[in-house]
Amino acid sequence: MARNMNILTLFAVLLGSASAVYHPPSWTAWIAPKPWTAWKVPPPAWTAWKAHPPAWTAWKATPKPWTAWKAPPPAWTAWKATPKPWTAWKAPPPTWTAWKATPKPWTAWKAPPPVWTAWKATPKPRTAWKAPPPTWTAWKAAPKPWTAWKATPKPWTAWKAPPPAWTAWKATPKPWTAWKATPKPWTAWKATPKPWTAWKATPKPWTVWKATPKPWTAWKAPPPAWTAWKATPKPWTAWKAPPPAWTAWKATPKPWTAWKAPPPAWTAWKATPKPWTAWKATPKPWTAWKATPKPWTAWKATPKPWTAWRATPPPTWTAWHGHGYGGYGKPGKPGKPGSKGPRGPAGPPGATGKTGRTGATGKRGPPGYPGKPGVPGRNGYVHIVFDGYGKWEIGKIERKNIREAVAKAWTAWNAGHGHGWTAWTAPPAYG
């Protein structure tokens, strides 16, 4: 099994190296230097701002008043150093020490039998079978084609560096550092007791009103005309279907289908017979050995002379156990985990909780992604896009304004995401 896995791993590595070396022309062209390389370098102001201010460095270096408080008190240190009266009580009794030093009758019984020792010393037939095949050993020692590729500098190393403007901005001090250090006026206000604390604890008159049924419950239900209208088919269902041009394009064969197909060399290799197929089909020498009865099977089934000895403790053990020093035995093996107990009865229903307060307004969400272009309409296109800040922009756009509207939506999306990709790729063209 291990040999098969080694061979499969070899072909997986070879296939992975081949796929890593080959790139289509579009990939090679894209690897060229990008216009956003300089933009990604952090400005010097940022690099300087990230550094610790001198006040912080000096504060860290000054001794703190709580260092002495954290040290243990002298009384504890002195108590730890004094000898304890229970040290002698914890020592094992002399009878236990003498018993441990005497040879035990079961020492010889625990030794493995001579036939086992001899069998362990003989060479096994599976030793040679477990060694890796010579082809694998030679392949492991041969130089690999991807070693040189890994050692060459890559063109994207410089692209990953942050831009200088970002580094400079990081290094400049920020105006909010001092504001954070000043005490705030609301700190004291938060600590004072509030007048509404007692009001919240008193029962409210609207608690009973909330529990009574309201006359407008039936009024809120949708009218039957609305329910019937929802169930009838709508004339715009067919209008929402994709245009025939899209359906026809989806049905035509694409030029990249052949590019995605596996290379002929891989297909041919898969079809050729493999050398390990015959090896798997041949009978193995250990199959017969596994089927033959073993000499230790009968030995395991016969009663052992030490079974009775284990059941009856010797008198010396019983007498010694009366000393009360039984805590010096070896720790027992951990017990097996217990089975799962029966399911307990259901608890009483909990009390109805109070209505929670209205939550605070949430933070602005992340920028949205551009929507897909709408299907054709009577006045050109109904174009639905994101404006780059998580809001929908829906409206009818004339055909002559399609390109301008899409370009604006694309630029807004780039600005909302903070990426400078406008120079890298042009907005999609519609109309």
From Swiss-Prot:
The modification 7'-hydroxytryptophan is found at residues 46, 49, 56, 59, 69, 76, 79, 89, 96, 99, 109, 116, 119, 129, 136, 139, 149, 159, 166, 169, 179, 189, 199, 209, 219, 226, 229, 239, 246, 249, 259, 266, 269, 279, 289, 299, 309. Produced by the byssal gland. Residues 322-377 are annotated as: Disordered. Residues 41-270 are annotated as: 13 X 10 AA A-P-P-P-A-W-T-A-W-K. GO terms for cellular component: extracellular region. Residues 323-332 have a biased composition (Gly residues). A- repeats lie at residues 41-50, 51-60, 71-80, 91-100, 111-120, 131-140, 161-170, 221-230, 241-250, 261-270. The keyword Hydrolase does not apply. Glycans are attached at residues 46, 49, 56, 59, 66, 69, 76, 79, 86, 89, 96, 99, 106, 109, 116, 119, 129, 136, 139, 146, 149, 156, 159, 166, 169, 176, 179, 186, 189, 196, 199, 206, 209, 216, 219, 226, 229, 236, 239, 246, 249, 256, 259, 266, 269, 276, 279, 286, 289, 296, 299, 306, 309. Almost exclusively composed of repeats of the decapeptides APPPAWTAWK and ATPKPWTAWK. This is Foot protein 1 variant 2. It comes from Perna viridis (Asian green mussel). The gene is fp-1.
